[in-house]
């Protein structure tokens, strides 16, 4: 399991916040989400996991235009990383010049595992999904998305083409302009002649032929930002899952999570699978 840690943590942070930040509650929500995902009885996957890797933003793209997080956000993030390491023996990936989704892509393509589950709420990472071994678990839907679902949602023929679709319609969340005035229906028409067996370069070339010259600069500028970098140096392999004794959970100040943790510990350390 390779986790887009910033996506998971940000959701927990803002869900915990009412008026003022609530770091302890944010920690509990983030850790509880991971415990639910590790438990085959609650993860809606029905599968166990033997290795984990959490990928964090080391740099924020200034083009996204997002406001700076408060100091407590970053301090709590470091506490969460430490707790996850103690609880699960997990590995963490972070690079000062790259965002977490690039680290996820690098780790996914480097892995030789039979099945890889990407955990994220970021639509950009859907482009890594394949029918065979790479699966996208959506934190928003709380389920693994099928390839057919992703293709239908974005009007494409393969998940790897999401970057092209986003370069056309834009993405206000990441401040990506796209082609002004072009939306999902335009993507659907542009992809009518695209087939699932076409390689990525051929897809871009075919779409390029249908884009008026005055829009091509916007398209390629946006495409450069929607593509994932899968060659980030120094990304570690996912680490074997090693769970601490449940008695130690209370000592970490996580008393409310003891029950959920104990169940996961029992499944992985007592029950055969």
Each model region followed by its residue ranges:
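Domain-level signal for Mg2+-assisted phosphodiester chemistry and nucleotide/NA-binding surfaces
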Residues: 1-86
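A generic signature of intrinsically disordered, low-complexity regions enriched in glycine/proline
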Residues: 8, 54, 61, 65, ...
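C-terminal domain-closing interface element
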Residues: 234-250
């Amino acid at each position: 399991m390779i986790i887009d840690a910033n996506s998971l943590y940000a959701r927990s942070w803002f869900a915990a916040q009412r008026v003022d930040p609530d770091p302890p509650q944010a920690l509990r929500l983030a850790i509880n989400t991971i415990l639910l995902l590790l438990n085959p009885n609650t993860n809606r996957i029905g599968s166990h996991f033997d290795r984990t890797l959490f990928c964090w933003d080391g740099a924020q793209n200034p083009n996204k235009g997002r406001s700076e997080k408060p100091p407590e956000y970053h301090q709590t993030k470091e506490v969460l990383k430490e707790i996850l390491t103690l609880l699960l023996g997990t590995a963490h990936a972070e690079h000062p010049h790259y965002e977490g989704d690039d680290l996820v892509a690098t780790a996914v393509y480097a892995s030789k595992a039979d099945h890889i589950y990407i955990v994220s709420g970021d639509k950009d990472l859907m482009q890594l999904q394949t029918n065979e071994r790479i699966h996208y678990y959506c934190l928003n839907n709380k389920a693994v998305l099928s390839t057919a679902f992703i293709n239908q949602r974005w009007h494409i023929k393969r998940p790897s083409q999401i970057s092209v679709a986003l370069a056309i319609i834009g993405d206000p969340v990441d401040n990506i302009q796209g082609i002004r005035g072009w939306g999902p229906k335009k993507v659907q028409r542009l992809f009518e002649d695209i087939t699932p067996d076409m390689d990525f370069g051929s897809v871009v070339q075919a779409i390029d032929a249908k884009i008026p010259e005055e829009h091509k600069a916007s398209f390629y500028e946006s495409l450069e930002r929607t593509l994932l970098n899968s060659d980030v140096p120094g990304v570690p392999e996912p680490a074997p899952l090693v769970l601490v004794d449940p008695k130690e959970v209370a000592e970490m100040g996580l008393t409310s999570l003891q029950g959920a943790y104990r169940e996961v510990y029992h499944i992985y350390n007592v029950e055969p699978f």
